[in-house]
Amino acid sequence: ARELWNAGIIYGFGTDSDFPPQEALRRELAALGQFFSDQETFAILTKNAALAARRDDALGTLDRGKFADILILDGDPLTDIENVFNIRIVIKTGRIVVDNR
C-alpha cells in the first residue's frame, strides 16, 4: 500500500460492510493506520474519496462552489484520526442536523 501511494496511486475511502457504520469505519481506520499517517488518512476519507467517485468537482474539499456538508469535531483529526468520532455539530445543506454542544 505504501509503495503504491508513494508511486502516486490515489486511495479513496468507501465501505459496503455489514457492520454498523461506526464500527466499520473504526475497522477501516485501523487498517489505514497501518500504512498511512493521520493526515494521509484524512485525505483518503475526504478529497480522495471524492476523486474515486469522480465527484471531486462538487465534493471532498471546502472550496467555493462545492457542497459543504460539514462536521465540527471536538479534536483535530489531522493529529489523531480517531477524533472523527468526536462529533459536536453536523451541518447538512446549511442546517444543523446534529448538535452535541
What are these regions (language model features)?
Residues 79:
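Small/polar (Gly/Ser/Thr/Ala-rich) solvent-exposed segments
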